[in-house]
Regions:
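Short acidic/histidine-rich active-site segments
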Residues: 237-238, 287-312
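Structural preference for beta-strand elements that scaffold enzyme active sites
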Residues: 10-14, 50, 107-111, 134-135, ...
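Conserved, mostly hydrophobic/aromatic
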Residues: 16, 43, 93, 132, ...
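Histidine/acidic residue-rich metal-binding segments in metalloenzymes
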Residues: 120-130, 134, 152-203, 216-231, ...
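A metal-dependent hydrolase metal-coordination microenvironment
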Residues: 37, 42-122, 126, 141-145, ...
């Protein structure tokens, strides 16, 4: 047992949560104390201590409004903390997380889900670092100045690329600043480029195993081995199409921001989370238990019911039986690694 394992063995971490997208929508509609009133009870009930909250920019804000939308989300988080003092805290490193947890609060960290807010201005990456952002996803599932993202399903397109020259600069500057790179949503070429140009551990915050669910959003066995060899961690994503194999046809909610997704073949008569254990065991068989955690990607709380069907867990309270079963399926130290200490090892690297 390492020092991190021992110090944080009861900590539960979700490395990818689209909380601020919902906070933005609800505050724009006039709601206040959004996190406290709509989200925190479920998070606490599930025993989740640390949330990495993404700064995601919908297409409608691009290209001109990407920076402003990201800053709006950060500003609204600070408004939420003022309105709900003592319930949750914005953290930037392991020391702040430990203090927050010891005070009985939920710890929130920030991640860029795509570098659209900085455009092609590298100085803005430093600005986001100073604002407390500590994780950098180079791209969502689209092209930007840094890289090509992968698609959820096959589309007609021209030749895809990996990292651009600017993307290489982002990789180098992020690591210089002490930020952690996130390869979820990158295409295979961009993943290989990150492996080539980065020097430090990187993560895949919300990606599963492609050998089990064959989508470009998941990692191949070779990618998992490369990520593990670098000391990284991957987070289990709760989207059904990334947990299970898919069948013919597509499903999505009307007027959704999500792309059309293939229908997931979910086994009947078993919990919807059953498929997660295939991914966990596959990763452990490949690289051991030190490189898998949670990255649930819960973005369904205020979405239509038809869109919630795309998720294993509509809300955090639905994760409770799964998190509890982790402790029964795996030895104590392995269960602790999956629940949170693997992610804490990464967070300990933050400055």
């Amino acid at each position: 047992m390492t020092g991190v394992d021992n110090a944080y063995r009861d900590v539960v971490i979700d490395a990818h949560y689209d909380l601020l997208s919902d906070v933005f929508r609800l505050r724009k509609s006039g709601e206040r104390k959004v996190i406290e009133r709509f989200f925190l009870e479920d998070v606490k009930a599930a025993g989740v201590d640390v949330l990495v909250c993404s700064l995601f920019i919908p297409d409608v804000y691009l290209p001109e409004m990407g920076l402003r939308h990201a800053l709006d989300q950060i500003g609204m988080l600070h408004c939420e903390m003022e309105e709900s003092p003592g319930l949750f805290s914005f953290c930037r490193n392991a020391q702040e997380i430990k203090k927050t947890i010891n005070n009985g609060q939920t710890a929130l960290l920030l991640s860029l889900e795509g570098i659209e807010p900085i455009g092609n201005d590298l100085v803005l990456l430093r600005v986001f670092y100073e604002l407390g952002v500590r994780f950098v996803g180079l791209a969502w599932s689209r092209r930007n100045y840094a890289a090509d993202g992968c698609h959820f399903s096959t589309i007609r397109e021209g030749t895809a690329g990996g990292l651009t020259a600017f993307g290489v600069q982002v990789v180098e500057e992020a690591e210089r600043l002490g930020m952690i790179l996130d390869v979820s949503h990158l295409n295979d070429a961009a993943f290989s480029d990150v492996l080539m140009f980065s020097k430090k551990p990187f993560i895949a915050s919300h990606s599963n195993c492609r050998a089990i669910s064959n989508t470009a959003r998941n990692l191949t066995d070779d990618q998992i081995k490369s990520l593990a060899a670098r000391g990284g961690v991957m987070g289990l994503n709760n989207m059904t199409n990334f947990v299970y194999e898919s069948e013919e046809g597509t499903k999505n909610a009307k007027n959704s921001n999500l792309p059309m997704l293939p229908l997931a073949k979910i086994p009947e008569g078993k919990p919807r989370f059953e498929g997660f254990f295939n991914h966990i065991r596959h990763v452990i068989d490949l690289v051991g238990p030190d490189h898998i955690g949670f990255g649930f990607d819960l973005c369904e709380f205020k979405k239509p019911e038809s869109e919630r069907e795309l998720s294993v867990f509509p809300t955090y309270k639905h994760t409770i039986p799964f998190i509890e079963r982790i402790g029964r399926e795996f030895p104590g130290i392995v269960a602790a690694k999956i629940r949170g200490t693997n992610w804490m090892r990464i967070i300990e690297l933050l400055r």
